[in-house]
Amino acid sequence: MTIYDQILANKTAGRKMFALLIDPEKCSEEWLCQVMSTVNSQQSTDNSQLFIFVGGSQLKESVFDIVEKIKRMTTVPVVMFPGDASQFAENADALLFLSLVSGRNAKYLIEQHIEASRAIKSSGVECISTGYILVDGGKLTAVERVSHTSPYPTTNPQLIADTALASQLLGHKMVYLEAGSGANRPVPQNIISETRKAIDIPLIVGGGIKTPQQMMDAFSAGADLIVVGNHIESHPDTLASLLNQL
């Protein structure tokens, strides 16, 4: 079963999913051991609801080594969450092939994809095309700075939902609503709900989620998979309480 098939099966069965986002430039050996221990102690028998995302907006080093290290520590699937074409590791289980559909910067709509396409195809790594939509999280985020694009305002849920639908019609397999790393607030429930009603494909939501209640609010609004990263970087002891919500 592919990673995408696994996600679809969970969505169809109503099983919610969680991804821990690891930024290789921000994780120490001690932190990684701690969070992997928590993940392994919480995981279900088949790991089907858990994922490790690896990536960041400003990575400068190769991610191959960190992916290899994580895969030695857990059987949970490792999925690349790349900020650009250089952030590709052929030892990952899958790759989110992100297109920044909320922006109009061609570099992140298609140019980075062209640059990485041959390496991805030759590697054989599963590639999951994903429409990536930035939503205002109340502060300037790294992805805004790097991509030179602005997030959609939370006052226009229809625009966000329509963009998600356009993404689906373009052939993207998933939609990712992103408030940004370290956002002051997560993606609002009404935006998640409107987007969920507009699309049939899996819906990922990340950015600004810090508590089990915020996670459950996103799930109840229609998110299929929640991504948490920045908060766990500074509060690794809270990971178990989030995983317990699955």
Protein language model features and the residues they cover:
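Catalytic cores of alpha/beta
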Residues: 80, 84-97, 198-228
